């Protein structure tokens, strides 16, 4: 294995807008959980200094981002960053726009920010350039990664020639591909193999390591929860195999939120999370993880998570196991789509009332890309997830029950072996089923009977109780029952917000 001369971050804070409550850094007086683009610089600093995250993702994809982030961090917190240097001790990692999926207006701005940050750090006598790697979301091919590297290199040379006197900018960045769908996650080793070859042809050098990002939210939105977790597990196993074959260290990152549908990483489920993501080296602690639990609990959970990730070992699978899981994933995606297509129109009014937490660009038109499932325009994963929880039908159930019921003995044995928390997860999720709300939905659209069948199938296999188990869950269920009956959008938003606080996440 190659020697790595950098710290690999284990804990990555992100700007995912899934928090129900008010962020701790806004102070006791604030009642507003919304975080403006301007406040995100304060947020980044607090993630480093108060929560001790190793890394913070700065998102240029489909949202407004402050290009002055490095100027402000260094100017406002010079003493801190003198002792905790960006690029050496702490890491700010840009998520670039994908120019193949959306208009890349902000790509050049992000790249020039990276270059000017290097100048600023040099002027302050910092030894490491602060921004040296970037995430490419929705990565599909090795050529895309090389093209982004080429654009950065050309821009660096142009800036050095035309705008920088006396010193040159570094002309390369390290790319972190973000694989979002089941297919790209499954075939990530093949894409990376091509990328390594192209990189060597282009530079004459070999890479000392790779960081690879696996999505946990959009994959669930696109193909359902069962398909998504199988995709993550297969990718982690295959990346480990590829790492061994190439004698190349690979450090997987998972983009996971507090809901089980989006990966199930919350301060109360660290052990569960580590069991379900064997071989993972970096986890995203999103906004709900950081802001919807007491600060001391969050700090303690981050320490536990870091320790666990540093010792987290990959799990091997036989070819037979992998092939069986691929077939199970396909079955489950089919069940998910069959049901979801008939329900999506009923949810539109809930999506529209969903509370906002960040300065995002509109998800339509020329500025942002729009995710589509079976031709339907879908909201972002957080909105989708929270909306289904809010109507008393956790999205984890959709398609999962019938898919599980259809498995033969071998398929069931292999699936449950690689999903050790299956029973515990769904026993917990069943607390958020509102029987009254579901019956109201069925009365308006009989297609909701399929979701009810999923719940019943899972209950018959796993033997759990349906409905609330405490006062907070009872109130959540009552609010779900109210939500599906009212028509006023403002009241809908208020009810969704109340439910989010009760369950410790927005979506």
From Swiss-Prot:
This is Phosphoenolpyruvate carboxylase. It comes from the Bacteria. GO terms for molecular function: magnesium ion binding; phosphoenolpyruvate carboxylase activity. Residues 1-25 are annotated as: Disordered. Coiled coil: none annotated. It holds the Pfam family PEPcase_2. Its cofactor is Mg(2+). It catalyses: oxaloacetate + phosphate = phosphoenolpyruvate + hydrogencarbonate. Belongs to the PEPCase type 2 family. Keywords: Carbon dioxide fixation, Lyase, Magnesium. Catalyzes the irreversible beta-carboxylation of phosphoenolpyruvate (PEP) to form oxaloacetate (OAA), a four-carbon dicarboxylic acid source for the tricarboxylic acid cycle. One of its GO terms (biological process) is carbon fixation.
